[in-house]
Amino acid sequence: HMVRRFLSQKKHENITFNFHQLHTRTLIEGLKQEQFDVVFCSYMENEPDIRFIPIINQDMVIITPPGHPLTEKSSVVLADLEEYPLIGYDRTSGLGKYCKGIYSSHGISPKVTCECPDEHAISALVAEDFGIALVADVEDIHEQNVKILPVSDVHLVHTVYLAHMKDQFMIPAVKNFIQFIRKEGTHL
């Protein structure tokens, strides 16, 4: 939506974007190799040459198939994830590493039966009763036949960042886009 708002301005109508859906590590390497001007990604530590601008906070929620036993509970806690097969994010992705850190810091060991690249794939498998999942609350999960349950014992938030090289030449269109996102695109 942010890109659409940017392009809807008359002064930006001749700017084009190329979109790629890749893991954070691959996107960061692409920035370093000048394949990309900017990327939307998770935060990565130990990247001193990259500026990470937080732009969106996404609540993390548990999704289940309709009629799942968790939908009958008055509240769902993070430890409930241990009781059922879990569909997870790809372990090498930003969200995969984030979720693994959540599980570790809360002392739980879910039974991950399958890993997927994104919420669309995860929610499709959950809808088909392959398991439950902890996911970012994004539009894709609302389009599937799943129940969306808030985690009641801890508030979990994943932040999406706009990232770019700190000391690299940028054409005016890229500078304008970054400035636009900083001014109008952040939803924290």
Where are these regions (language model features)?
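Secondary-structure junction motif
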Residues: 1, 85-106, 170-178, 188
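Central regulatory/effector-binding core of bacterial HTH transcription factors
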Residues: 1-48, 115-116
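Extended ligand-binding regions for polar small-molecule ligands
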Residues: 8, 79, 159, 163-188
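Alpha-to-beta junction loops
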Residues: 15, 31-40, 60, 108, ...
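Short hydrophobic/charged patches on amphipathic alpha-helices used for structural packing
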Residues: 28, 32, 52, 78, ...
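Flexible hinge/capping segments at coil-to-helix
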Residues: 47-60, 64-86, 172
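Beta-alpha-beta core module
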Residues: 47-54, 58-59, 73, 120-167
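Thr-Gly-centered strand-to-loop micro-motif
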Residues: 65, 72, 89-90, 112, ...
